[in-house]
Curated annotation (Swiss-Prot):
It is an enzyme of class 1 (oxidoreductase). Induction: By heat shock, salt stress, oxidative stress, glucose limitation and oxygen limitation. NAD(+) binds at residues 46-70. This is General stress protein 39.
Length: 286
């Protein structure tokens, strides 16, 4: 078993979604002994938030399985270039697309650019997100509410709506949700609401697209060490992050790749409308 850190040094970042290169320790995004088995060979995957965190881990794992990758990210260019470099070392293509996933026009352009430059689209991973803790609903402005929903939920709606113009039977859509809509979080009210919307969207789109042979599933991470954490919380909160899980530590991005590879591959051909929980041992109900 890998020896992942149970405690994190106190640290914080001033802007979201955060910079992976500034984190200490660096998130673990790759199993060095992971050997791909061509599970995604010849396929094209578009991954939002693919520059860092869980998105980086998924990008690298998909590359090892033979997929060409389009990474959609906001403006963390250094992280994106580092991920692209690692992806291309696997002998596949990697396209970087920077912009605001909360805008429908950009989402349409991202899908079209992926199809044009990589030759198609087989896998959509809706992974981008942001969060802004507040002590009370009274502290959540309309601007924050709209911004959080645009990034977390509207982006998934826009990208899915456009992607189905190109997705063929056997294709997969994977949405990143969270443990929060299952257990609640009184300081992340708007964020948790977006994740609840994603859960409903996943199930509904699974029903809507099953006739087209397109599977739609989700992954619900627990407390995971990604750039969003130091970019969200004060340093004293970061120092305790993840220690309240049964495993007593935060998860690492790499610990999700098995789920995302499974849901993208033919190994999950009889799964749709489902959510896989990666949360360090917390039991939740659906």
């Amino acid at each position: 078993m890998a020896n992942y850190p149970k405690e994190l040094p106190a640290q914080t970042q001033s802007r979201q979604p955060g910079i992976e290169s500034e984190m200490n320790p660096s998130p673990v995004y790759e199993y060095e002994d992971y050997k791909g088995a061509d599970k995604l060979k010849g396929k094209v995957a578009l991954i939002t938030g693919g520059d860092s965190g869980i998105g980086r881990a998924v990008s690298v794992a998909y590359a090892k399985e033979g997929a060409d990758i389009a990474i959609v990210y906001k403006d963390e260019h250094e992280d994106a270039e580092e991920t692209k470099k690692r992806v291309e070392q696997e002998g596949v293509k990697c396209l970087l697309i920077a912009g605001d996933v909360g805008e429908e026009e950009f989402c349409n352009e991202a899908v079209e650019k992926t199809v044009k430059e990589l030759g198609g689209l087989d896998i959509l991973v809706n992974n981008a997100g942001e969060q802004h803790p507040k002590e009370s609903i009274k502290d959540i402005t309309s601007e924050q509410l709209h911004r959080t929903f645009k990034t977390n939920f509207y982006s998934q709606f826009y990208l899915t709506k456009k992607a189905i113009d190109y997705l063929k039977p056997g294709s997969a859509i994977i949405n990143t949700t969270s443990i929060n809509p299952y257990v609640g979080n009184p300081t992340l009210i708007d964020y948790t609401a977006t994740k609840g919307a994603i859960n409903a969207f996943t199930r509904t789109m699974a029903q809507a697209l099953v006739k087209d042979g397109i599977r739609v599933n989700a992954v619900a991470p627990g407390p995971i060490w990604t750039p969003l954490i130091p970019a969200t919380f004060p340093e004293e909160t970061v120092a305790q992050f993840g220690q309240d899980t049964p495993m007593g530590r935060p998860g690492q991005p790499v610990e999700h790749v098995g789920c995302y590879v499974l849901l993208a591959s033919d190994e999950s051909s009889y799964m749709t409308g489902q959510t896989l929980h990666v949360n360090g041992g917390n039991f939740v109900t659906t």
